[in-house]
Amino acid sequence: MLDNQLLRENPQYVATQLLKRGFQFDAVTFSQLEEKRKALQVSTQSLQNERNLRSKAIGEAKSRGENIGPMREEVNKLGAILEQQKTELDEVLKQIEVISLSLPNIPHESVPVGKDELDNQEIRKWGDVPAFSFPVKSHDELGEALGQMDFALAAKITGSRFVVMKGHLARLHRALIQFMLDIHIQQHGYQEIYVPYIVNADSLLGTGQLPKFEADLFKLTGDNGYYLTSTSEIPVTNTVREMILSAEQLPIRYVCHSPCFRSEAGSYGKDTKGMIRQHQFEKVELVWITKPEDSYNALEQLTQHAEIILQRLNLPYRVVALCTGDIGAGSAKTYDLEVWLPSQNTYREISSCSNMEAFQARRMKARFRNPDTNEIQLVHTLNGSGLAVGRTLVAIMENYQDEHGNIHIPDALKPYLGGIDIISVK
């Protein structure tokens, strides 16, 4: 959510900044609603004061034994007008809130201006793209040939965009989770956190998934209004909702492993085969809560921490700065890490690292006390995948395959697999 004061005082500036995203904000309509709000608030306050004065006069007249009938009738008329204006004011406030909740974040000045992913800017590359002397296979072909990855069975159990893994591939998948957690906790200094995989609407509103992106979520039946979490960013970030932190507590750095559940609305026809786009997948998430002045340095650190996982696994990747037309609605700036997939002969996203600035904090009322001014200020929140586990498995399978369809284990993962160094076709 954007700053209400900024919206009220300079809606045209907001409209200009959001236009960089391709988002049309009707500043004129918003300003008209604001003028109506101010007029109604002044009017209702005036009517409230007038009614209070007249009610007091009725009490005084009654104590003197005077006829208060006409006076009471006038107060009742005032009360009816007041209630009508309160109703109008509530309606205007709701309209303003709907608009405010629909607005995306203002992009940081360093974000490249562009329309879509074609305008994203490559920042750096790491690692050499492997050259194979044989026709490469996709991860799903490799997994099915190994007899350890079964999409048809998953479709029978549930439906499309699910997978059943077993044997060494399932073990490799689990090893990746532990490896990522160990690096982030032991070497990067994150605190591990375990959170619910089911969240309520307030949490989703706080991090910005609601109201705009409900179609991307799995909502549970019943009266609780619960949803399966689409990323552990949601519950982890909401741990500071409606809190006033001390400056000494910042920065907070959490790492969390969780399953994620996404409906993939709008993804019809995209990545229909394999594990690239699933309804259920695992992710190791990094979340930072910082002071405003520290958040962009934190974004660089968070991104580097995610990169280190790819480097330890010796997976070629690149870092891309998303343009204004491609960053997520709540993000002020985002770096994507894209890993090389030989079967597609291209880089594919494996992590998004974002600075949300105060966008989520304002929704969540997540604040801290500034010791220099003693003022209560909004924190900044950041998040990034460190990494998406399924896509990391995909990248290992494809980059570490041999001509026989075997998968060689990266050196960094061998201690997690009891000495297994190859997953072989039987």
UniProtKB/Swiss-Prot annotation:
Pathway: Aminoacyl-tRNA biosynthesis; selenocysteinyl-tRNA(Sec) biosynthesis; L-seryl-tRNA(Sec) from L-serine and tRNA(Sec): step 1/1
Enzyme superclass (EC): ligase
Location relative to the cell: Cytoplasm
Biological process terms in GO annotation: selenocysteine biosynthetic process; seryl-tRNA aminoacylation
Organism superkingdom: Bacteria
Enzyme Commission number(s) from the entry: 6.1.1.11
Disulfides per UniProt: none
InterPro entries given in the database record: aa-tRNA-synt_IIb (IPR002314), aa-tRNA-synth_II (IPR006195), aa-tRNA-synth_II/BPL/LPL (IPR045864), Ser-tRNA-ligase_type_1 (IPR002317), Ser-tRNA-synth_1_N (IPR015866), SerRS_1_N_sf (IPR042103), SerRS_core (IPR033729), tRNA-bd_arm (IPR010978)
Catalyzed chemical reaction(s): tRNA(Ser) + L-serine + ATP = L-seryl-tRNA(Ser) + AMP + diphosphate + H(+); tRNA(Sec) + L-serine + ATP = L-seryl-tRNA(Sec) + AMP + diphosphate + H(+)
Pfam family of the protein (one): tRNA-synt_2b
Keywords from the UniProt entry: Aminoacyl-tRNA synthetase, ATP-binding, Cytoplasm, Ligase, Nucleotide-binding, Protein biosynthesis
Any GO CC annotation of this UniProt entry: cytoplasm
One Gene Ontology term of the molecular function aspect: ATP binding
Assembly mode: Homodimer. The tRNA molecule binds across the dimer.
Record-stated family: Belongs to the class-II aminoacyl-tRNA synthetase family. Type-1 seryl-tRNA synthetase subfamily.
Function: Catalyzes the attachment of serine to tRNA(Ser). Is also able to aminoacylate tRNA(Sec) with serine, to form the misacylated tRNA L-seryl-tRNA(Sec), which will be further converted into selenocysteinyl-tRNA(Sec).
NCBIfam families linked to this entry: serS (TIGR00414)
Domain notes: Consists of two distinct domains, a catalytic core and a N-terminal extension that is involved in tRNA binding.
Protein name: Serine--tRNA ligase
Record organism: Legionella pneumophila subsp. pneumophila (strain Philadelphia 1 / ATCC 33152 / DSM 7513)
